[in-house]
Amino acid sequence: MKLYIMRHGEANYPQGSYSDRERRLTTNGEHEVTTTAKWLIDKQPKVDCVYVSPYIRAQQTASILLSHLKTGQKQNCDDITPDGHAGSVVSWLAAEIQQHGYESVVLVSHMPLVSYLVHELDASVQPPIFPTAGIAVVDFSPETLRGKFQQLLIAERCAG
């Protein structure tokens, strides 16, 4: 099955009383997400489910993504925040995929978790540094909890 691990778009830094959870996408971040979403719909027009962090910038990213994709559903997941545990997320995600018979899934999250997830799935790959709105493409086997990293896409390359 295809697993797309996506980092949220560029976000403002927390100011004043705003917490990290409340950071919002910048105008550039919205553009980045739109660009990578268009690439994704060309490669994978139907996605079974989009799993998304509860943080505002990830929710905004998922909303833009979902406006371009044909998808069965969106599901919030409290475990895919920046300090989530990659091994636990992979086990949980594999169970979800097997339970529902999904063939393609997008996970919208944050650094450093997105980087650790790629390495957890494919230990032959060093944890990549994700740019904002970057998408890692992984062929994932939920039965073995392993995957094969295919590529890391960035908005600038998707636009060209």
Features from the language model and the residues they span:
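Active-site-proximal alpha-helix that buttresses catalytic centers in soluble enzyme cores
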Residues: K2-G84, V114, V125-A133
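Generic beta-sheet signal
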Residues: L3, G101-S109, L113
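Short phosphate-binding loop-to-helix
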Residues: T81-I97
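Short, well-ordered, mixed-charge alpha-helical segments that flank or form enzyme active sites
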Residues: S115-L117, C158-A159
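Domain-level recognition of soluble alpha/beta enzyme cores
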Residues: D122-Q150, A155-A159
